[in-house]
Amino acid sequence: MDQKIVDALAITPASSASERTIDITTTGAKTGSPRRIEIWFYRSGEQIYLTTQPASRSWYANLLANPAFTFHLKNGLRADLPAWAEPVLDPIERRRIFSDIVADLNQPLHRGYLSQPVEPVEDWVAGSPLVRVSFPESLS
């Protein structure tokens, strides 16, 4: 993978909202049509994840039906990356990942656009969509 892309994906808790804001294009679960939305991405360990605050989301339903999608970097570096979504369903794994994400969101720099503290980890585990993102070997 190009080093500029690796750097753009290497967010930390100190990363700004714009650094973690991307678009994704999924394939509609019912329509088969492309659906593009804006979303934040997160890191836990060396992995990249997509999630949102607890709620039902159409992007998640789309990825469950069609896990291939496009991950659009758009702030600073612009790149359209073929990607694959794998739902994270194991409660223990979800708790570990959401603990990292909630700690990230509760950083002081996010106070301007997020009510803090965000929902408790258990609320995220019980009600938030969570997918692990991988990129095809062709990007390597």
Predicted regions and their residues:
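Short beta-strand segments
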Residues: 19-53, 69
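Extreme N-terminal tail/first-helix region
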Residues: 1-21
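A generic structural micro-feature
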Residues: 16, 31-33, 63, 125
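Short, structured beta-strand-loop surface elements
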Residues: 54-139
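General secondary-structure edge motif
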Residues: 12, 21, 43-44, 78-81
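A generic local structural motif
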Residues: 8-11, 36-37, 117-119
